[in-house]
UniProtKB/Swiss-Prot annotation:
Primary enzyme class: oxidoreductase
Organism: Kocuria rhizophila (strain ATCC 9341 / DSM 348 / NBRC 103217 / DC2201)
Name of protein: Malate dehydrogenase
GO molecular function, one term: L-malate dehydrogenase (NAD+) activity
EC numbers: 1.1.1.37
HAMAP family recorded: Malate_dehydrog_2
Binding of NAD(+), residues: 12-18, 106, 113, 130-132
Length: 328
């Protein structure tokens, strides 16, 4: 195969999301069916035996695009030469853990990983954060990698975007492919704002097809609380859908999103739409060749402004908390 393999690092590789993710990467779902990949997989030492089992399965699939797999527990070894880093692993919130405890536990992880990426990753690396709290984990990693441009870091709100697209399509009797120009703003949390003001379904304004009451009373809260509903139903958090969204996010970032549409991605704000500069917040973006651009010139309604501001306020609170902990 003539194309040079891309080195992809994945953290938390033995977890449920990792298990759903790795086979699709090796199959070519993320970087295309012509591009070989080298997988570099990071786990904590106690999870390495399980990860070895996953590697055996990857080998047994005989994927033509899988050039090589290496595993380890040292981010400086795993990230060496990485061109795309998918930071999936994170400390989950456990019973009795306060929000500040969660930020502190993940802060240590993403501080170390940010520094390692800064020191050993490829000079043109792209970093995608899936592990929650994704926005603030991305901020911590980015601030601890001063030699990597901030625009190279992004965090996952594609799962929220996909949930919103699917729900709007179901409500209007349309295909998901018919839904365009939907936006998710703010934090990947219950304060996120899935915005239909500019969305279209088969060319028609979405708000001509659904009621404001449905949007406010059903659509927004259902999308925001979907993760909790899945956790309650299956006894475990979203894994396959989170992996799928990570694939979608990274594919669009590296290969470009669909023409004539945009997607949602948490990126380092440049001050657009009143979101404080430097904050990692979700915006509508277009993507091409590893770069993203925030969609400009959208009219923001009074209702939308209030929802965006509320989510941004939560992000500012998280940033203040990690600043207080000395993580950024």
């Amino acid at each position: 195969m003539s194309l040079t393999p891309v080195t992809v690092a994945v953290t938390g590789a033995a977890g449920q999301i990792g298990y759903s993710l790795l086979f699709r990467i090796a199959h070519g779902d993320m970087l295309g069916r012509q591009r070989p990949v080298r997988l570099r997989l990071l786990e904590i030492p106690s999870a390495l035996p399980a990860l070895e089992g996953t590697v055996m399965e990857l080998q047994d699939c005989a994927f033509p695009l899988l050039a090589d797999v290496e595993i380890g527990s040292d981010p400086r070894e795993v990230f060496d030469g990485a061109q795309l880093a998918l930071l999936v692993g994170a400390r989950p919130r456990t019973k009795g853990m306060e929000r500040g405890d969660l930020l502190e536990a993940n802060g240590a992880i993403f501080t170390e990983q940010g520094r390692a990426l800064n020191d050993v990753a490829d000079h043109d690396v792209r970093v995608v954060v899936t592990g929650n709290p994704a926005n603030t984990n991305a901020l911590i990693a980015q601030r601890n990698a001063p030699d990597i441009p901030a625009s190279r870091f992004s965090a996952l709100t594609r799962l929220d975007h996909n949930r919103a697209v699917a729900m709007l399509a179901a409500q209007t009797g349309a295909s998901v492919d018919d839904v365009k120009h939907l936006s998710v703003w703010g934090n990947h949390s219950a304060t996120q704002y899935p915005d239909l003001d500019h969305a279209r379904v088969a060319g028609r304004p979405a708000l001509d097809l659904v009621s404001r009451e449905w949007v406010q009373d059903t659509f927004i809260p259902t999308v925001a609380k979907r993760g909790a509903a899945i956790l309650e139903a299956r006894g475990a958090s979203s894994a396959a859908s989170a992996a799928n969204a990570t694939i979608d996010h990274a594919r669009d970032l590296m290969l470009g999103n669909h023409r004539g549409d945009w997607t949602s991605m948490s990126v380092v704000s440049d001050g657009s739409y009143g979101v404080p500069e430097g904050l990692v917040s979700s915006f509508p973006v277009t993507t091409s060749g590893g770069d993203w651009s925030i969609v400009q010139g959208l009219d923001i309604s009074e209702f939308s402004r209030a929802r965006i501001d509320a989510s941004v306020a939560e992000l500012e609170s998280e940033r203040a908390a990690v600043q207080e902990l000395g993580l950024i």
